[in-house]
């Protein structure tokens, strides 16, 4: 769209537009904040009056009720939950935000889809091409080998990394919840189609793509299937695509891990990956300081952050929907 190309051109002339300290962000659930996307439009004056110029809308794409993981089990990357509105409503909202100098962020859940996604439904029905988009197995032999080295994300509420599907006599990889099927990025169709979905959202006016659970997107037997080199290759490719197609859009990586594992997601000066990463450690250290009334840990951590190259841009935040740990 022409208005978005104009934004791209403006940001290309000022590539450091997001690196200052003049961006104040707000996270919100559409239904809790204003009921619908139309309701958010009607509250933009209030948002602006708070000094907010960065609006992170929590997951609002179509996902099955009762099996949506807060919207992180996406059934269709090109439809909004009906109770919140439509894709056209989203486009209108982002356009109004841009008129008021507000950038818009949306989660891009790239590790998995809902079991209700069209690909998953076809895979469950036996389509071999659709099954190749996920990790399907006839028995537990290979899944059990994965389990020997792969940590569990939710060992209490969703133990294991695989789920048995009795209706089709198959085992499928489900790192998070049983209704979230992991995508197989070794299949180039998956990468191509998911990047196409990402670009669809940028054409809806999304300025910041939050790459959800990015360390998990590549799996390999005999490893923890976290932070593997192929993950960085995929993120680097996404960065290259975005710089060509939508150069004004930022990639924000969600890497909730210790600092040594977070920094590599910036890439390098000549081969950049994410534009921004969450400053997870500072957030946790801030709450530790409040609880202990001891600034020592926070001071040491901030000294480490300030010693990093200027090219590294962190999104500093106080809290989010995830736990503090």
Positions of the model-derived regions?
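Acidic/aromatic-lined carbohydrate-recognition and catalytic surfaces
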Residues: 1-192, 199, 203, 214-288
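Receiver (REC) domain switch/active-site residues of two-component response regulators
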Residues: 207
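Catalytic-core regions of glycoside hydrolase
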Residues: 294-297
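Generic recognition of flexible, low-complexity loop/linker segments
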Residues: 14, 196-197, 240, 303-305, ...
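Active-site-proximal substrate-binding groove within the catalytic cores of carbohydrate-active enzymes
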Residues: 301-325
């Amino acid at each position: 769209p022409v208005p978005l190309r104009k934004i791209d051109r403006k940001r290309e002339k000022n590539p450091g537009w997001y690196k200052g300290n003049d961006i104040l962000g707000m996270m919100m659930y559409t239904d809790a904040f204003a009921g619908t996307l139309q309701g958010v439009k009607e509250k933009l004056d209030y948002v602006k009056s708070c000094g907010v110029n960065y609006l992170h809308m929590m997951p609002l794409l179509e996902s099955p009720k009762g099996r949506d993981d807060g919207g992180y089990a996406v059934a269709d990357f090109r439809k909004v939950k009906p109770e919140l509105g439509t894709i056209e409503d989203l486009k209108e909202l982002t356009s109004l935000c841009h008129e008021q100098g507000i950038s818009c962020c949306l989660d891009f859940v790239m590790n998995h889809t809902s079991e209700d996604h069209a690909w998953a439904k076809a895979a469950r029905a036996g389509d071999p091409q659709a099954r190749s988009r996920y990790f399907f197995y006839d028995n537990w032999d290979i899944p059990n080998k994965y389990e020997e080295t792969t940590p569990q994300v939710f060992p209490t509420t969703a133990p294991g990394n695989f789920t048995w599907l009795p209706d089709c006599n198959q085992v499928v990889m489900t790192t998070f919840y049983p209704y979230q099927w992991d995508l197989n990025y070794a299949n180039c169709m998956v990468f191509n189609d998911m990047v196409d979905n990402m670009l669809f959202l940028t054409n809806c006016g999304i300025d910041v793509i939050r790459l959800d659970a990015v360390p998990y997107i590549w799996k390999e037997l005999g490893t923890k299937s976290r932070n593997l080199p192929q993950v960085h290759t995929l993120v680097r490719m996404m960065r290259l695509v975005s710089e060509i197609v939508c150069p004004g859009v930022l990639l924000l990586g969600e890497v909730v891990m210790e600092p040594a594992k977070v920094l590599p997601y910036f890439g390098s000066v000549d081969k950049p990956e994410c534009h921004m990463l969450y400053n997870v450690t500072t957030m946790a250290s801030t709450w530790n300081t409040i609880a202990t009334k001891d600034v020592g840990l926070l001071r040491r951590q901030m000294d480490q952050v300030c010693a990093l190259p200027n090219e590294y841009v962190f999104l500093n935040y106080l809290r989010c929907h995830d736990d503090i740990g």
